[in-house]
Regions:
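Bacterial N-terminal signal peptides that target proteins for export
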Residues: 1-3
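Structural signature of eukaryotic scaffold interfaces centered on beta-propeller domains
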Residues: 87-102, 144-152, 202-206
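Extracellular C-terminal loop/segment signatures of secreted glycoproteins
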Residues: 122-145, 172-194
């Protein structure tokens, strides 16, 4: 009985729509474009944003038509089913739509090529359904609904995720997007706080709060190494402006930043010939006497006796093209150099 009702409902969706042939023709056009252009074949022409313009136009038409028809056709569930069919036709596309107030927001992942993926916002313009704006960044887009701004304007968070490394680290950009009349604009972005790149291990967006666990930059930080310091920051909405305020949270493996700060002071003292500072870092005068002024840090991972709470750590260095090993030992909250010497071949 239920299956029969579902079939009747499906038939109604096809026959009751004012121009039922439209979506079928549009889907066929989409399939033809996907086959003919061989997108993602690695050529510069096949990976450019312009190559996807016609495909985006078809998807925009599909969504705008459904929103204009209204009723069940304008529901998130119906639109998602239709867009899933387009995604299956292309194979490489993934489209997710979410309702944000009176807006319909879509996250379109069409390719791994830079600048191709987009977030597209649909709503009413002059009383008609329309595409209001698009955002395009590098990475895979994910849309999270957000509480309205103090004045009631609709908002959402757009996350742009890069590909994960073998260690589970990925580039991330977060944008808070707010409706302003018939337009939308980014009112806050993580790129303002992290202009180079925000490399995260994990993040979450829920209940008016964003948590981000990432690798901060500091002297001695070496990308790709285990056991380095990670920070967890919390972003919450400011009551007055509705934009996000950063609140520092906990640190993981804080010992590595402290160790590397000690190592940096050691290298600086050697380069400057600062014997007083050197004596505070190296208690043994014989070890101090062996250290060359040309000693510099080497871009290699540290060797610690524990990744979470080490007592001794070996740090790689170099002097006049000769590799050195520096052994630091923790005494309370301080790190001191207790052994040093060239690495024999």
């Amino acid at each position: 009985m239920l299956a029969g009702l579902a079939m009747l409902a499906g038939a109604a969706l096809v026959t009751d729509r004012p121009d039922a042939a439209g979506p079928l023709d549009r889907l066929d056009q989409f399939r033809t474009l996907a086959r003919a252009r061989s997108l993602g074949n690695g050529s510069p022409e096949g990976s450019s944003p312009d190559t996807y313009r016609e495909m985006y136009a078809l998807l925009d038409e599909e969504i705008v038509e459904s929103l204009g028809t209204g009723g069940l056709y304008a529901s998130t569930g119906f639109l998602q089913d239709r867009l899933d069919a387009f995604g299956e036709a292309w194979g490489a596309a993934a489209v997710d739509v979410v309702r944000v107030g009176r807006l319909m927001v879509g996250a379109f992942q069409m390719s791994d090529a830079p600048g191709v993926n987009s977030v597209r916002v649909y709503g009413r313009l002059g009383g008609e359904a329309a595409l209001l704006t698009t955002l395009s960044r590098d990475g895979r887009p994910v849309v999270y609904p957000w509480a309205p701004a103090p004045g009631g304007a609709a908002q959402f968070v757009a996350a742009w995720e890069g590909s994960a490394t073998g260690r589970g680290i990925r580039a991330l950009r977060l944008d808070l997007v707010r409706q302003q009349g018939d337009d939308l604009r980014v009112v806050w972005s993580s790129s303002d706080l992290f202009p180079e790149a925000l490399m995260v291990r994990a993040y979450s967006v829920r209940s008016g709060e964003i948590r981000v666990r990432y690798e901060p930059e500091y002297r001695g930080h070496t990308p790709g190494c285990e056991g380095q310091t990670e920070a967890e920051d919390v972003f919450r909405a400011a009551p007055e402006s509705g934009t996000l305020v950063r609140r520092a949270g906990r640190e993981v493996n804080a010992w590595h930043r402290e160790l590397r700060a000690t190592a940096a002071r050691l290298f600086d003292a050697l380069a400057a010939g600062d014997e007083a500072s050197l004596a505070k870092l190296v208690a043994d005068p014989q070890i101090r006497g062996r250290l060359p002024s040309t000693l510099r840090p080497d871009a290699a991972c540290d060797a610690a006796d524990s990744l979470t709470n080490p007592v001794t750590v070996s740090v790689a260095a170099t002097a006049e093209h000769t590799p050195w090993a520096l052994t630091f030992r923790r005494a309370g909250a301080r790190w001191r150099l207790t052994a040093a010497g060239p690495v024999l071949p």
